[in-house]
Structure formats: C-alpha cells, structure tokens
A protein has these predicted regions:
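C-terminal scaffold of the Radical SAM
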Residues: 1-3, 22-46, 56-325, 329-375
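Short active-site neighborhood of thiol/selenol oxidoreductases, capturing the structured segment around
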Residues: 5-7
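Local cysteine-cluster metal-coordination motifs and their immediate loop/turn environment
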Residues: 9-20
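Short amphipathic alpha-helical interaction segments
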Residues: 375-388
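A short, conserved structural fragment
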Residues: 390-404
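Minor-groove-contacting beta-hairpin "wing" of winged helix-turn-helix DNA-binding domains
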Residues: 404-405, 409-414
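Short, amphipathic alpha-helical interaction segments positioned at domain boundaries
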Residues: 415-430
Length: 430
C-alpha cells in the first residue's frame, strides 16, 4: 500500500505564522494544474517497496498546501481524475482536502462529497468526479481578535458556518486544526476554543503549539518586541488542558498533536509515522519509496511549471534526477534540478523509526526494530531507554507471546513526558 500527497501552493493571503511554501499568484493556477497532472502521469512507473507505483494499492490521497480550497471545483476534479486514471486508488481510500473556513461557499457543490443525493443536472456536471470523503479545516482559534492578529481571513462565525455546511453536505469525517500559545492568548481563551471545538460534532482534532519560524511575520514582530512568546509554564498548562478535554470527550490521543474519535485516526498521517511509501506531487513536495530513498521536488513554482509543462518523454523524468544546474528544457534555462534524491543510511532510517514511533500512542514497534536493524541495535535502544524507564518517562508494553529477549512489544512515551519528548528522542537516536 502507499499514499499520495498533492501540494497546492496557492493562498489568497499569507498568515503571520506560516513558513510553508506558497504563493498568492492566482494567475498561475491554470498552468500549475496542467504541470501537476503531467507530473502525476509521468511518475506512475516509479518503483516503490510495494511494487510499481501504478500497481500499488493507494489507500490515502491528501491535498495540502498552501490552500487547496483556493482551486475551483473543476480544477480539483481534473487533478483527482488524473490520479485515479494513473494509480490504483482503493474504493475505500481516505481522500482528504485541506480547506479554509469560508471557501466552501464559492468552491464546492454538495455533490462533491460522498453520501449526498444530487439532482440530475448536478449529476451530469459531476460525471467522473472522484469524491473527497474527509476535510481538514484550518480554524486555528475561535477568538476573532487573535484571528486578526495572525492574519487569518475568516472570523469565528465563518468557521462555525463552514462546519455546519460540511455536515449538511454529508461529510462525516471532519478534522479541525487549532493553535495554542498565540501571542497574548490566555488559558481561558484556549479553554473556550476547546469548548467550541468539541461542541461541533467533529471527528478529529489537530492542535499545535505556535512556532516562530524564521522569515515569518510573527517572527519579525517578536524580534521587534511587538509580540511575545508564551512562556513554557503556560504552554504546558494549555497542552494539559487539551489532553484532559479530549479524553473527556472520548477522543483518542493517538499522536502527540492529534486526537480522534475511535475509527477516525488520520490514515494518511499515520502512514507517514509507520514508514509507508508515499508519492508527493507539486513544488517542495517530498516522496519516500519505502526502501531508503527520499525525493524532494524543487520548491520553485515557476521552474516546476516550466519543467512539467515541457517534457514529453516519461523516461526524462528519471534521467534528470540529478540534472546539473544550468540544464535547459524547452530551450529555457532551468537554474536547478527539478528534484533531488537522498539515500538514507541505516542510522538515519533507525533515527526516523524512533522519532516517528515515539510520536504515536502505540510507540516504537520493537519487533520491527529488531527485524530491520538487528538484535544489537534493539539492545542499544533498550539500554538508552533505561534511565527514562526508571524515571517513568517511557513505558514498555509487554506480551509474553512475542519472541523478544525483553518480551516487550512497544516502547512508548508516558503522557507526562510528552512535553520533553524531543530530549528523550535525542537520547534514543543513534
């Protein structure tokens, strides 16, 4: 099995905290859709650990950004149809669309989503459309003053209305994103955000501590003393409140920043943490073949459009993996290679398995560590974990039926240690 990630690098405006690759140049959208579909089609013969990409069962498709909901319905349909035509997408695949509150009004008809009866006119319009069955809504906070501060385009009433519209359209798998530790945000404001979020009948919640990334507007404001970072004590209190409320509402804390009702874990994100191969399409998108090779697409939107709008021979996509700077395509100079490849060492693969495993409630699969990296590496991991086990920062889950010298199946973080997880991960890595 494998997953597909589609990067839509367009935003109507840039948020104050965002450092993801995106642009506000809407005039490039049409050309981008053409180039994107070319990349999707050209890469169908890539070799993944599970087999040739076009023959592997695709279990998740994820539209991220940027803001995928800035595209027209017809443009999203073209991209989805291209994916389904070139890859074996499972009938029950999870297909997620990231969306901003308010975009539903102008973007999608209800028939875009599964489970909604449509009129004959709508049905004819939607022939061939591959349905989205999960929406991830970027709300961030329900406080209007904080929304203005971080330069979000919507207000709280728009966010609430969008959730209601999605539910009315038959979408029964809705995730929302929240941010805590915003400048000036109090614990009472955060408690209000959580109260509203859990009252909406959503199935999934992702909540992240605000990060001041270099080059962002918020980072500049902090350096100019216009805003101040939340202190550690407040951040810990907010995270503790998040975990408590989620538990009360019956949400499973299945990853450090992710909470879901039973049966609604994000299958796409879970595949990343489990080391499943995935194909990433679009500028700055990353891919992993399931063996040891990572691919990173050139982040330049202009060069991406130039390259994928001009090549015809699918084999060229492979031959140009390490194309030198200054190569030309369609008689135009391309300053950088369209993508780069990285072969991960055993140590890097081990470190990634540790980091991804510890982020989840299940923890590190010790049988997998022994199978992939050997008994010696497993013993080294358990030795490095020993001080944290004694201090109850790590927990060993045991099962006598499993043939491991330690009789343990998984090594996981104690919930009380999540706030120092980075330090613990560092101790366990090679």
């Amino acid at each position: 099995m494998a997953g597909i990630y589609v990067h839509i690098p367009f935003c109507k405006s840039r948020c104050a905290y965002c450092d993801f690759y995106s642009t506000t140049r809407a005039e490039l959208v049409e050309a981008y859709v053409v180039a994107l579909c070319n990349e999707i089609a050209l890469r169908h013969n890539e070799q993944l650990s599970e087999g040739v990409a076009s023959e592997v069962a695709i279990q998740t498709v994820y539209f991220g950004g940027g803001t995928p909901s800035t595209l027209k319905r017809s443009q999203l349909s073209i991209i989805l149809n291209c994916i389904y035509e070139n890859y074996h997408v499972e009938p029950d695949a999870e297909v997620t669309l990231e969306m901003n509150p308010g975009d539903l009004d102008s973007l999608l008809s209800p028939s875009f989503f599964e489970g909604k009866t449509v009129s004959s006119n709508q049905a004819s319009e939607e022939i061939g459309l591959r349905h989205v069955n999960r929406v991830s809504l970027g709300i961030q906070t329900f406080d209007d003053e904080l929304l203005k501060l971080i330069r979000r385009r919507h207000d709280s009433s728009t966010a609430l209305r969008t959730v209601e519209q999605l539910q009315a359209a038959g979408v029964d798998n809705i995730s929302i994103d929240l941010i805590y530790g915003l400048p000036g945000q109090t614990i009472e404001q955060w408690q209000h955000d959580l109260k509203v979020a859990f009252s909406l009948g959503i199935q999934h919640l992702s909540a992240y501590a605000l990060s001041y990334e270099p080059g962002t507007l918020l980072s500049r404001w902090r350096d100019e003393k216009r805003v101040h970072e939340a202190d550690e004590e407040l951040s810990v209190a907010m995270y503790s409140e998040l975990c408590r409320r989620a538990r009360e509402e019956g949400f499973e804390h299945y990853e450090i920043s992710n909470f879901a009702l039973p049966g609604y874990h994000s299958r796409h994100n879970s595949s990343y943490w489990q080391g499943t191969p995935y194909l990433g399409f679009g500028p700055s998108a990353h891919s992993y073949d399931g063996f040891r090779t990572r691919r990173a697409n050139n982040p330049s939107l202009n060069e991406y459009i130039q390259y994928y709008s001009s090549i015809i021979d699918p084999s060229a996509n492979v031959m140009l993996a390490n194309a030198p700077k200054g190569s030309t395509f369609n008689s135009q100079p391309l300053r950088n290679s369209p993508f780069s490849l990285e072969s991960l060492t055993d140590s890097e693969l081990f470190d990634e398995a540790v980091m991804c495993g510890l982020r989840t409630s299940q923890g590190i699969d010790l049988a997998m560590i022994e199978h992939r990296f050997g008994h010696g590496r497993l013993n080294s991991l358990l030795q490095a974990a020993s001080p944290h086990l004694v201090a109850s920062r790590l927990i060993l889950d045991r099962a006598s039926s499993v043939q491991l010298s330690s009789s343990a199946t998984h090594l996981r973080l104690a919930e009380s240690a999540i706030m120092i997880s980075d330090d613990i991960m560092s101790d366990l890595m090679s």
